[in-house]
């Protein structure tokens, strides 16, 4: 389960492998955890994820 501390660290780009594992294991069994997140946290999580995917192309 994702704790609030993990979410804060997650938004800070904790670990790319861990981030990918969390996204790949997203399913109906843990949606209640995600529903407890604010929309801002969810937005930042995906912003961080896509920034990581695009960093080679954007050279940031």
UniProtKB/Swiss-Prot annotation:
Keywords in alphabetical order, please.
Host cytoplasm, Lipoprotein, Myristate
**What is one Pfam family matched by this protein?**
E7R
Main subcellular localization, coarse class? host cell
UniProt subcellular location = Host cytoplasm
Is Lipoprotein set as a keyword in this record?
A: yes
Q: Does the keyword Lipoprotein apply?
A: yes
GO cellular component terms attached to this protein's record: host cell cytoplasm
InterPro entries listed in its UniProt record = E7R_orthopoxvir
Summarize induction of expression.
Expressed in the intermediate phase of the viral replicative cycle.
Q: How is it modified after translation?
A: Myristoylated.
Q: Which family does it belong to?
A: Belongs to the orthopoxvirus OPG069 family.
Would you tell me the protein name for this molecule?
Answer: Truncated protein OPG069
Protein source organism? Variola virus (isolate Human/India/Ind3/1967) (VARV)
């Amino acid at each position: 389960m994702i704790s609030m501390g993990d979410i804060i660290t997650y938004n800070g780009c904790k670990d790319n492998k861990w981030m990918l594992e969390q996204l790949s294991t997203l399913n109906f069994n843990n949606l209640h955890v995600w529903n407890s997140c604010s929309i801002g946290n969810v937005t930042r999580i995906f912003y961080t994820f896509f920034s990581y995917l695009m960093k080679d192309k954007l050279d940031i």
